[in-house]
Amino acid sequence: MYMTVKQAAEKWGISDRRVRILCSEGKIPGVTREGRSWKIPEDAKKPEDGRYKTTENLLEKIDRKKTELDSRRPLTEGEVERLTEEFVVEYTYNSNAIEGNTLTLRETDMVLRGLTIDKKPLKDHMEAVGHKEAFYFVQDLVKEQVPLSESVIKQIHYLVFADKKDDRGVYRRVSVRIMGAKHEPVQPYLIQPKMEQLLDDYRNSTEHIIPRLARFHIEFEGIHPFIDGNGRTGRLLVNLELMKAGYPPIDIKFTDRIAYYNAFDEYHVKHNLGAMEKLFAGYVNERLDSYLAML
């Protein structure tokens, strides 16, 4: 029995073009060609892709660093509090800026301290405060090791989406489009079953936490379950799961937003998870380095 290039691409999570290249390079045992079509054995294994060895090596480094971090003395309560305060300001600034919030890093810090910025929208103030509250809520979930669920996701969105009370923590009921994106979010009637499937797939996955979360994040944003606030909610979910697994939270920088956007397109157009995986791995690695340098 054979499968087509398209079937192999879907099975292995790569692009049709990449499958054809692997066929032409003789990297798939038993493959044959009939005219312009490739016939691939149904039981063929996905060939190793040397292009992603760098990411695989980085994951190994990350695992070693995490093991080393776990073996060192824990931070004191005061140290943790100080580091969290600093992280929350930058994280709130970057995550909101990616979505169009106009507050600068300094202004975000001031707003989170209870000040009001003249000539800046109330919405921007509320987004900053809501994001901070959502992150501290996520920390509480981590302490209690609360399993990821639709209820948890809706609670986080409720805090994030502070400026639109009627839409907080509620799945959207209208169709939406993401400007400039190469993927169209699902129709409203599909949100519930898609979210259930996403969570089932995530729970049953045996992948390393980083590619596992890279895939979850892209799929979550692709479903786009809420009318707005999906990006901020999605990035908080990534940090919820990273911290539950014993890793430090990451902060995707506003300055890296183009690479971040491109990682979504790479997955939706070419079925290539590598770009998002590499982005996440790089951030986790940097955070581990900063923690190890302190201990």
Identify the function of each model-found stretch.
Residues 1-28, 36-228, 232-295:
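FIC/Doc superfamily catalytic core
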Residues 32:
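Double-stranded DNA-binding cores of transcription factors and transposases
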